[in-house]
Amino acid sequence: QGLFFLDGVMYESTGQYGESTFRKVDLATGKAVKRLDFDKKYFLEGSVELKGNIFILTWLNKVAFVYDAKTLTYKSTWRYPREGWGLTTDGKSLIASDGSARLYFMDEQFKQQKVLTVKMNGRPVQMLNELEWIDGKIWANVYMTDMIVIINPADGNVEGTVDCSGLLPKSLRDADTDVLNGIAYNPKDGRIYLTGKCWKRLYEVRLVER
């Protein structure tokens, strides 16, 4: 549900009721170095680090959690006013999606600062899900599709798209395999990683312009 890098280390939040976790992951093996398990009533969604804290959204629980980024110790729980989907940051604000065409900019207490409507060719882009801030742009995967849109954070206009169809071969798909749903950028080396719900692989990708 959430995927991001902090100091060259990958972190991941996973969903489903009774299965939701937050994990610090060894990129080489894919195994959890440290793992937080959540009560079965919670369905975790997007997560991100901002100013020394890790923020984690829930889908329908209307709460968000804050943990210390260094120790992964619990700090606080906040009321959250909408469905939690994706979460990223520009280094100043939290930026969240809720499955609509809107992105919500918030402070660290989840107080709304502004709302951005994302449009492509003048039309709102619905079902924005997982988010990642990459080189001054917001990348968002469009839920239930293999498309990522690259968004100008100033005006909400889509400036490009990434076609991820064919990323996961049929040989690695099974009954549990779900949609594209993971974008992570490692600012230390500029690498971009993509994955999906219940995928058995994490892919390092490079864009080819078409």
Task: Describe these PLM feature segments.
Residues 128, 175-185:
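Signature of short aromatic-glycine-proline-rich micro-motifs recurring in repeat-based ectodomains
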Residues 25-30, 68-72, 107-111, 152-156, ...:
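Short loop/turn segments that connect beta-strands within beta-propeller blades
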Residues 7-8, 51-53, 91-92, 135-136, ...:
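Short coil/turn segments that connect the beta-strands within blades of beta-propeller domains
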Residues 64-121:
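Hydrophobic, well-structured mid-protein blocks that either form specific transmembrane helices
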Residues 11-16, 54-61, 96-100, 140-144, ...:
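Conserved beta-strand positions in repeat-built beta-propeller and related beta-rich domains
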Residues 35-40, 76-82, 116-123, 162-166, ...:
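Surface loop/turn motifs at the tips and blade-to-blade linkers of beta-strand repeat domains
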Residues 1-21, 36-48, 85-86, 196-198:
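Beta-strand-rich domains and repeat architectures in extracellular enzymes and scaffolds
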Residues 29-66, 72-84:
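Blade-loop segments of beta-propeller domains
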